[in-house]
A protein has these predicted regions:
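Short helix-capping/hinge motifs at transmembrane helix termini and TM-loop junctions
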Residues: 63-64, 92-93, 163-167
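Alpha-helical membrane-inserting segments
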Residues: 59, 79, 83-88, 92, ...
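N-terminal transmembrane-helix/juxtamembrane module of multi-pass inner/ER membrane proteins
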Residues: 1-53, 89-115, 206, 210-215
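Membrane-helix interface segments
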Residues: 33-36, 65-70, 141-148
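Membrane-embedded catalytic cores of phosphoryl/pyrophosphoryl-handling enzymes
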Residues: 106-215
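Interfacial segments of alpha-helical transmembrane regions
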Residues: 56-86
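Transmembrane-embedded, aromatic-rich helix segments that form part
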Residues: 52-56, 171
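Membrane-interface junctions
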Residues: 27, 31, 45-49, 63-64, ...
Length: 215
């Protein structure tokens, strides 16, 4: 299996880490007999193509009270997708961990559903999208609940390692790119004019004058 210099460097530099963490995460499988597999598949589904996260950001964008969250999330997702999907995945072109059928990770992959992904491995797009959208919620939200946003993002990364569709270093790369995208998104969102956050995308019936007054 031929790989380019960038992918080869990742494999040689982080190979031990990738295998060690994957084996540690898979102790969950050993302890629970596959109980965690459907859970991590559901978590992973929410990051597929970023669709669920995009829909969430658009829903928050619709209402004035949550528009700052939605705006930052949309910007973060866009920045993360550009860096990850349009640049790094193409340039580095790292094969998925299950491609090497002689490796221990392939054996783990066989145990947890044999999920196949169509694009390259580094960095993790799911993890990028999770952090790019959740970091703004953490920064802008009430700290009594916003920590759960980061919990979701970290769980997404663990899910990708557990399902053996990413190396640990892929997930770390996604974490870095996603966090960067999320922070930049917050900065941009704070600099947008206040008029954007005061726009009415809809008008409730209660805001319309009664027929007797409009006649």
């Amino acid at each position: 299996m031929e790989i380019n210099a960038a992918a080869a460097w990742l494999n040689s530099t982080f190979g031990n880490l990738d295998v060690s963490v994957a084996l540690a995460v898979h102790k969950l499988y050993d302890m629970a007999g596959g109980f965690f597999t459907p859970f991590f598949e559901v978590i992973s589904f929410f990051g597929k193509g970023g669709i669920c996260l995009i829909l969430l950001s658009l829903a928050l964008l619709f209402f004035k009270k949550t528009r700052r969250f939605g705006t930052a999330m949309c910007i973060g997702l866009a920045i993360g997708a550009l860096i990850t999907n349009c640049c790094l995945k193409i340039v580095i072109a790292r094969p998925r961990p299950y491609v090497d059928q002689n490796g221990i990770l392939y054996q783990l992959w066989l145990l947890v559903g044999q999920n196949v992904e169509s694009d390259k491995s580094f960095p993790s797009g799911h993890t990028t999208a999770a952090f790019a959208s959740m970091v703004p919620l953490f920064i802008l939200g009430n700290k009594r609940w916003s920590w759960t946003a980061l919990l979701f993002a970290f769980t997404m990364g663990i899910a990708r390692i557990y399902l053996v569709v990413h190396y640990t270093s892929d997930v770390i790369g996604g974490l870095i790119v996603g966090t960067f995208a999320g922070i930049v998104a917050v900065i941009i969102a704070k600099k947008l004019p206040q008029k954007w956050y005061e726009l009415e995308f809809y008008k409730s019936k209660s805001s319309q004058p009664p027929d007797s007054l409009s006649a």
